[in-house]
């Protein structure tokens, strides 16, 4: 081997594992950290050991093997035994764009990010329901300022950026907000959640009982009407709900009103509160009761019309069932699954619409094949007198319900019915596994977040210092600042990070 080949060879020690390659290989990706190792003055810019003739980096050796192979082959693959965030950090350190990951490994690389987005989508209330934390904390038992700030940030935007208690409002606002919003924030929050759950169940039970004949006796009523020359008494009969059910509903509404007002007053972010669909449901379910009580004493015709309309829209009370999503993880998982599977549901609707249109048309003409000459409309021997009627039959058949109110009576119609049933099974079976997988993913993430131990303190890594082995000093020492190949963007980012840390030094860190 010639002397020129020896001078082109370079040794890189990453985490105790030595890697050998050629400088020409490192030059294939200019502007990256490894490309700077191929420069003549790299010995003064990185941690170089002249005795071992190697550069040292205290990084993950297994990930570096894949990164070095990217320089050799031009294809960047993601190791299956490395967590996604770790691989992402290594790519950022070596200055490699994540979009260079091969398509075969992109799903593996994106898996961790999708999981993080799924966890973040669960929103404010944490899924950690540790009994020890619940018993230890209360609205008056708070931890340090960091715990209060973290709790407030989880639930909404904080009015106190520094998280320090300063006054009655700043101290009690996040606690009372968590008391009514986060059932797992404290022991007393659990009591409030149990009370809310009890009133929800009582209200829904009362709503259902009000429709039973046993609780709606028929009473005789009289009404005096004004006529041209006097008055006229009109007798009529009307179903009237038992009074005790109205009283029970009134007690439930009083609790819901108190809960809603407390959440409105102590909400840190009023705009986000108004946009929340559950809060809109709470308001819509409460309002008709007060309007009905206020208008029940009026005798005008307009008031009676409005009162009759309010009695019709009592069904909005059933929407309170959605309040249970605050207390049950499974319901939240189902909601996130439905939102995440919107594309699959749209695809299913499109497939069903196409199938309904096709088979409704086919069954209409198939049933007309056997029509008698004296019955040109085929109304005597078939239920399918037109195509729109066939839409109902096609929907029932493709969804495998089969009510039996409409069915084909000719051999050609039976053949179309069989094809319609088979097509419906295949159409529904295609998007269902995707929806089931989404539910399984969200449920596993919810269980993982529920069992995740509470982190007391978060370690803040020390920023790279000037002269550090992992610090790229090319921007400081190199006289070239003109092109991307002569400028180290990684060093620029690290210098900006040091400058930011120098302007606002962190506790326990020396700059």
Curated annotation (Swiss-Prot):
<keyword id="KW-0862">Zinc</keyword>
<dbReference type="InterPro" id="IPR000210">
    <property type="entry name" value="BTB/POZ_dom"/>
</dbReference>
<keyword id="KW-0813">Transport</keyword>
<dbReference type="GO" id="GO:0019894">
    <property type="term" value="F:kinesin binding"/>
</dbReference>
<keyword id="KW-0472">Membrane</keyword>
<keyword id="KW-0633">Potassium transport</keyword>
<feature type="binding site">
    <location>
        <position position="77"/>
    </location>
    <ligand>
        <name>Zn(2+)</name>
    </ligand>
</feature>
<dbReference type="GO" id="GO:0044305">
    <property type="term" value="C:calyx of Held"/>
</dbReference>
<keyword id="KW-0407">Ion channel</keyword>
<protein>
    <recommendedName>
        <fullName>Voltage-gated potassium channel KCNC1</fullName>
    </recommendedName>
</protein>
<dbReference type="InterPro" id="IPR011333">
    <property type="entry name" value="SKP1/BTB/POZ_sf"/>
</dbReference>
<keyword id="KW-0770">Synapse</keyword>
<feature type="modified residue" description="Phosphoserine">
    <location>
        <position position="142"/>
    </location>
</feature>
<dbReference type="InterPro" id="IPR028325">
    <property type="entry name" value="VG_K_chnl"/>
</dbReference>
<feature type="short sequence motif" description="Selectivity filter">
    <location>
        <begin position="400"/>
        <end position="405"/>
    </location>
</feature>
<feature type="modified residue" description="Phosphoserine">
    <location>
        <position position="160"/>
    </location>
</feature>
<feature type="topological domain" description="Cytoplasmic">
    <location>
        <begin position="1"/>
        <end position="190"/>
    </location>
</feature>
<feature type="topological domain" description="Cytoplasmic">
    <location>
        <begin position="268"/>
        <end position="276"/>
    </location>
</feature>
<keyword id="KW-0479">Metal-binding</keyword>
<dbReference type="GO" id="GO:0014075">
    <property type="term" value="P:response to amine"/>
</dbReference>
<keyword id="KW-0851">Voltage-gated channel</keyword>
<comment type="subunit">
    <text>Homotetramer. Homomultimer. Heteromultimer with KCNG3, KCNG4 and KCNV2. Heteromultimer with KCNC2. Heterotetramer with KCNC3. Interacts with the ancillary subunits KCNE1 and KCNE2; the interaction modulates channel activity.</text>
</comment>
<feature type="binding site">
    <location>
        <position position="104"/>
    </location>
    <ligand>
        <name>Zn(2+)</name>
    </ligand>
</feature>
<dbReference type="GO" id="GO:0032590">
    <property type="term" value="C:dendrite membrane"/>
</dbReference>
<dbReference type="GO" id="GO:0021759">
    <property type="term" value="P:globus pallidus development"/>
</dbReference>
<dbReference type="GO" id="GO:0045211">
    <property type="term" value="C:postsynaptic membrane"/>
</dbReference>
<dbReference type="GO" id="GO:0010996">
    <property type="term" value="P:response to auditory stimulus"/>
</dbReference>
<comment type="function">
    <text>Voltage-gated potassium channel that opens in response to the voltage difference across the membrane and through which potassium ions pass in accordance with their electrochemical gradient. The mechanism is time-dependent and inactivation is slow. Plays an important role in the rapid repolarization of fast-firing brain neurons. Can form functional homotetrameric channels and heterotetrameric channels that contain variable proportions of KCNC2, and possibly other family members as well. Contributes to fire sustained trains of very brief action potentials at high frequency in pallidal neurons.</text>
</comment>
<comment type="similarity">
    <text>Belongs to the potassium channel family. C (Shaw) (TC 1.A.1.2) subfamily. Kv3.1/KCNC1 sub-subfamily.</text>
</comment>
<dbReference type="Pfam" id="PF02214">
    <property type="entry name" value="BTB_2"/>
</dbReference>
<dbReference type="GO" id="GO:0046872">
    <property type="term" value="F:metal ion binding"/>
</dbReference>
<dbReference type="GO" id="GO:0009636">
    <property type="term" value="P:response to toxic substance"/>
</dbReference>
<dbReference type="GO" id="GO:0071774">
    <property type="term" value="P:response to fibroblast growth factor"/>
</dbReference>
<feature type="modified residue" description="Phosphoserine">
    <location>
        <position position="158"/>
    </location>
</feature>
<dbReference type="InterPro" id="IPR003968">
    <property type="entry name" value="K_chnl_volt-dep_Kv"/>
</dbReference>
<feature type="binding site">
    <location>
        <position position="401"/>
    </location>
    <ligand>
        <name>K(+)</name>
    </ligand>
</feature>
<keyword id="KW-0630">Potassium</keyword>
<feature type="transmembrane region" description="Helical; Name=Segment S5">
    <location>
        <begin position="345"/>
        <end position="366"/>
    </location>
</feature>
<dbReference type="GO" id="GO:0042734">
    <property type="term" value="C:presynaptic membrane"/>
</dbReference>
<feature type="binding site">
    <location>
        <position position="400"/>
    </location>
    <ligand>
        <name>K(+)</name>
    </ligand>
</feature>
<feature type="binding site">
    <location>
        <position position="83"/>
    </location>
    <ligand>
        <name>Zn(2+)</name>
    </ligand>
</feature>
<feature type="glycosylation site" description="N-linked (GlcNAc...) asparagine">
    <location>
        <position position="220"/>
    </location>
</feature>
